[in-house]
């Protein structure tokens, strides 16, 4: 057993990398630790490419084991079930970072597994997972170009915080994860509280500087392990075939990419591709396969579009580099929903619906760092059905992409939501992508803002989002505003920014190349701000503040009762509160502090529930007159029900000014009489009838 270990300090944390003790049959295996948080990272790759493989089959799976925090799973089977949203998002985070570092043409299957085996309640495992993946890939021998580093950045009181703890993040205006190589940033994922572009860019630069120590130590660790790289040779380019496609079909391809409508353009490109295959397949003595012709046809497509952009020709749909596509904005189009909006930007369209529910509808989330489940009162779900791109497909489980896009849109909105105390609803927003041609997640941000305001949610400010792109060849580059799907596919960067007129709420960046500069990011942020303000201006012309007159908005309130009245409200075995719910058809929840939350979609139902709760929990007032029912006669007086579950004693001496020998001579059970509360003694109610009678 040849164990190798490397330790270094990163900010306030101690990072340790170890290999040679666990999972020795994997091609690369590292036990990575950040303080007491430990993850086991394994890398396995097939030595050969599958026949006909035309894509890079990289899979990254981040798995949180409940035993890592001394817990047993709560499911019936007592095993970890399907991936949580956190696991899916972390898997995507790492995948997006490492994918650009594999060489073009490498098609061997690679599986990366990250297992959290010990979790500290203060340290998020995602950063150490990223560093562990970097180390495991570096020692595995696969053609992974260079180590990566990653760090989380917070921002509080005008200062950046490196790898903040969970507690520090609660007081931070920024939660940003940045990853990249020693030369460039490859990935950014962030959520912010309306911060300026300058602060956001400064955080990216700060993170890049801080994770250099990790890259240096991972490189040294790789050298110490001494793993040999695979003898992988990149496929040789068929220059003759590439030249033939350019010469024979280049002009047609260039012309096709001037067709503005996506489906028409794709149909024309498909026709040209089929013509190229028919003309060039088996043309030379070695024979060109249809797959090979199609492969190089895509290369010509890519170079054609990129050259047009770099030469400052008009873009595919005729726009210049800084123009946002035409917008069409509608609200309230679904008549029986609480709030709705249809946001259309060019050929991208999102139908966004807001639903308001009681606090009891909150999503319960289990987290490694928390011993108790936490309530999530804001949900944003993103759906991408196949029809939105003119295709058929299976409607199976939620895809990773849908989870990721929904999370990004949620991050763009969260900073502007009211607190649960200010707005005691569970809010669910669903974005149905009904058409897609680029930047559907940012359309979801815009549609969500509109839909929330239509539902009457008092958001702090309208929010809009925009996706930026990049085409770069050597020193030439062009930043594109509001990219199309083809520009995203054929370009070098996907840079998404969401925020208000005051600042940035969310920033996500994915890079396909390794030479993104500070200047490029600065230009992208500047253009994104201009576009965001433009979109907000058009959105504000349709709706700029919450719709307080929406008749579909549910009614809710919180009534504060004394804690000793909780049992009166609940009743024996829940009989009282169940009766109120059944009678009023409202939703009612009460907590241990005496907060009673009443919710209903109907005004009459709501009013009935409120009155019934007040009646049951009301406290009699001294000197107030009540009309009560005689419920029991005793020798020393009578018990009078003056409120629901509230009986008071009318003493025989308080029935009349005259001497009363027998109570039944004056009142009988079932009689309704007026009485006055003359005293409260340790919960006992003292009543008088005679004070209301003339002497």
From Swiss-Prot:
Cited Pfam families: KH_1, PNPase, RNase_PH, RNase_PH_C, S1
Domain annotation KH: ranges: 554-613
GO biological process terms held by the UniProt record: mRNA catabolic process; RNA processing
Residues where Mg(2+) binds: 488, 494
Cofactor: Mg(2+)
GO cellular component assignments: cytosol
Keywords: Cytoplasm, Magnesium, Metal-binding, Nucleotidyltransferase, RNA-binding, Transferase
Domain of life per record: Bacteria
Reaction(s) catalysed (UniProt annotation): RNA(n+1) + phosphate = RNA(n) + a ribonucleoside 5'-diphosphate
Domain annotation S1 motif: ranges: 623-690
Annotated TM spans: none
Enzyme Commission number(s): 2.7.7.8
Record-linked InterPro entries: ExoRNase_PH_dom1 (IPR001247), ExoRNase_PH_dom2 (IPR015847), ExoRNase_PH_dom2_sf (IPR036345), KH_dom (IPR004087), KH_dom_type_1 (IPR004088), KH_dom_type_1_sf (IPR036612), NA-bd_OB-fold (IPR012340), PNPase (IPR012162)
SUPFAM superfamilies linked to this entry: Eukaryotic type KH-domain (KH-domain type I) (SSF54791), Nucleic acid-binding proteins (SSF50249), Ribonuclease PH domain 2-like (SSF55666), Ribosomal protein S5 domain 2-like (SSF54211)
Subcellular location: Cytoplasm
Single annotated GO MF: RNA binding
NCBIfam families the record matches: polynuc_phos (TIGR03591), PRK11824.1 (NF008805)
Subunit structure: Component of the RNA degradosome, which is a multiprotein complex involved in RNA processing and mRNA degradation.
Function: Involved in mRNA degradation. Catalyzes the phosphorolysis of single-stranded polyribonucleotides processively in the 3'- to 5'-direction.
Family listed: Belongs to the polyribonucleotide nucleotidyltransferase family.
Protein name listed in UniProt: Polyribonucleotide nucleotidyltransferase
Gene transcribed to yield this protein: pnp
